[in-house]
C-alpha cells in the first residue's frame, strides 16, 4: 500500500527565512501564493510586464516583480506557467538567476520529463502537485482542510530536497489531506494519459458519439443532451465519493444491469489496445514532440479543432438548456 504523509510528517520551519517566488498568478499560482503567505512564508510573485494578473496579486497583498527580479530575490522558485511557455521563460528569465542552494520547483513534470528544461546540477529540483484546481486548493485551505497532493524529487543537490518538498506541500495545505510521493516520470506520464484517454479526450468523444447516435436515430437533441452530457456529473460525483461500487449501489437495477452487459461492448480489448498506443506515444516522447511543434507554429491545428468542436450541435443545444439550471448561473 502506498504511504501517505500528513502534517506531522512535514517540517514547515524548513521554509523559514526563505523567499518563495511564485512565477505566474493563474489558478494554481494564486492558491500557492496565498496559502503559503497565510502559512507565514515570505512570498513574492513574478509576472511579465503588463500582466493582467498584477493588479489582482497586489490587491491580495503580495509584492510583484518581473520574473527575472523575482527569481534573483528568491531562494525558492515555483514555476506555475502553462507547459508551452515554461522553457522560453526559464531560459530567458529564470536560469540566469539560479545560484547554488536555490530550489526550482514545478506542479507538473512535463518540461523536466521531456528534457525541455535542464536545470544546473547545483539546485534542488522538486515537484508539488495538488490534485485539484487552484480555487479548490485555496478554498479548502481557508476552511481548515486541504487538497491531496503529489510530491517528487528530481535532483537533490542540498541533500534535503525531499524534506523541503514536503514542507512546501504542508505550506499549501496538502498534508492536511495527505501527500503521496512519486517521481517526475510517473506523474507526467499518468497525468497525460488520464487527460487523453479518459478525462478529456476519451470522455469528450464518448459524450459526443452518444449524443450523435441518439440524434441520428431521430430522438430530440435536448433529450440526447440530458442523457449523454448533463447526467455525466451525477454519475461521476457518485464515483468520486465512493468508487464504482457505490455508484452502482446508487443507480437503478436496470441501469446497473445495462452497465455490466453493455459497457464492455463499447470499451473492449480494441479500445484498450488504442489506450496502450496512446500511452506509448506519451512514454516515448511522440506526444510531447508533436505538442511542442504545434505550439512553435502558434497552434494552427489546435485552433482549427477548437473552432470545429465549438460548432458541434451539442454545444448549441447545451447553451440553451443550461439556462434552465439556476445552480449553473
Swiss-Prot record:
Residue ranges of domain KARI N-terminal Rossmann in the record: 2-182
List of residues binding Mg(2+) 1: 191, 195
Pfam families: KARI_C (PF01450), KARI_N (PF07991)
GO molecular function, one term: magnesium ion binding
Pathway in which the depicted protein is active: Amino-acid biosynthesis; L-isoleucine biosynthesis; L-isoleucine from 2-oxobutanoate: step 2/4; Amino-acid biosynthesis; L-valine biosynthesis; L-valine from pyruvate: step 2/4
GO CC term, one of those recorded: cytosol
Binding, NADP(+): 25-28, 51, 53, 83-86, 134
Domain of life: Bacteria
Cystines in this chain: none
Keywords: Amino-acid biosynthesis, Branched-chain amino acid biosynthesis, Magnesium, Metal-binding, NADP, Oxidoreductase
Record field: catalytic activity: (2R)-2,3-dihydroxy-3-methylbutanoate + NADP(+) = (2S)-2-acetolactate + NADPH + H(+); (2R,3R)-2,3-dihydroxy-3-methylpentanoate + NADP(+) = (S)-2-ethyl-2-hydroxy-3-oxobutanoate + NADPH + H(+)
Alphabetized PANTHER family for the sequence: KETOL-ACID REDUCTOISOMERASE, MITOCHONDRIAL (PTHR21371:SF1)
Family (UniProt): Belongs to the ketol-acid reductoisomerase family.
Purpose: Involved in the biosynthesis of branched-chain amino acids (BCAA). Catalyzes an alkyl-migration followed by a ketol-acid reduction of (S)-2-acetolactate (S2AL) to yield (R)-2,3-dihydroxy-isovalerate. In the isomerase reaction, S2AL is rearranged via a Mg-dependent methyl migration to produce 3-hydroxy-3-methyl-2-ketobutyrate (HMKB). In the reductase reaction, this 2-ketoacid undergoes a metal-dependent reduction by NADPH to yield (R)-2,3-dihydroxy-isovalerate.
NCBIfam families associated with the record: ilvC, PRK05479.1, PRK13403.1
HAMAP family documented for this protein: IlvC
Protein name: Ketol-acid reductoisomerase (NADP(+))
This protein's encoding gene: ilvC
Amino acid at each position: 500500500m502506498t504511504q501517505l504523509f500528513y502534517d506531522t510528517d512535514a517540517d514547515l520551519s524548513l521554509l523559514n527565512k526563505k523567499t518563495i517566488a511564485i512565477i505566474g498568478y493563474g489558478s494554481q499560482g494564486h492558491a500557492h501564493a496565498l496559502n503559503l503567505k497565510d502559512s507565514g512564508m515570505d512570498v513574492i510573485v513574478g509576472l511579465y510586464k503588463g500582466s493582467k494578473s498584477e493588479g489582482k496579486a497586489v490587491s491580495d497583498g503580495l509584492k510583484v516583480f518581473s520574473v527575472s527580479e523575482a527569481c534573483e530575490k528568491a531562494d525558492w522558485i515555483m514555476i506555475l506557467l502553462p507547459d508551452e511557455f515554461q522553457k522560453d521563460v526559464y531560459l530567458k528569465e529564470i536560469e540566469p538567476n539560479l545560484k547554488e542552494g536555490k530550489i526550482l520547483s514545478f506542479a507538473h513534470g512535463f518540461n523536466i520529463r521531456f528534457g525541455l528544461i535542464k536545470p544546473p546540477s547545483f539546485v534542488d529540483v522538486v515537484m508539488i502537485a495538488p490534485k485539484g484546481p487552484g480555487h479548490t486548493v485555496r478554498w479548502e485551505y481557508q476552511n481548515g482542510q486541504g487538497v491531496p497532493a503529489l510530491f517528487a524529487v528530481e535532483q537533490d543537490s542540498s541533500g534535503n530536497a525531499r524534506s523541503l518538498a514536503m514542507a512546501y506541500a504542508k505550506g499549501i495545505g496538502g498534508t492536511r489531506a495527505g501527500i503521496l510521493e512519486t517521481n517526475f516520470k510517473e506523474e507526467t506520464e499518468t497525468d497525460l494519459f488520464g487527460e487523453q484517454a479518459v478525462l478529456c479526450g476519451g470522455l469528450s468523444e464518448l459524450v459526443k458519439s452518444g449524443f450523435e447516435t441518439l440524434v441520428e436515430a431521430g430522438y430530440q437533441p435536448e433529450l440526447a443532451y440530458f442523457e449523454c452530457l448533463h447526467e455525466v456529473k451525477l454519475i461521476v460525483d457518485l464515483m468520486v465519493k465512493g468508487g464504482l461500487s457505490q455508484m452502482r449501489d446508487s443507480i437503478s437495477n436496470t441501469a446497473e444491469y445495462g452497465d455490466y452487459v453493455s459497457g464492455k461492448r463499447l470499451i473492449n480489448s480494441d479500445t484498450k489496445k488504442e489506450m496502450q498506443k496512446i500511452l506509448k506515444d506519451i512514454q516515448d516522447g511522440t506526444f510531447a514532440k508533436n505538442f511542442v511543434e504545434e505550439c512553435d507554429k502558434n497552434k494552427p491545428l489546435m485552433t482549427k479543432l477548437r473552432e470545429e468542436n465549438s460548432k458541434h450541435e451539442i454545444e448549441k443545444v447545451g447553451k440553451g438548456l443550461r439556462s434552465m439550471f439556476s445552480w449553473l448561473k
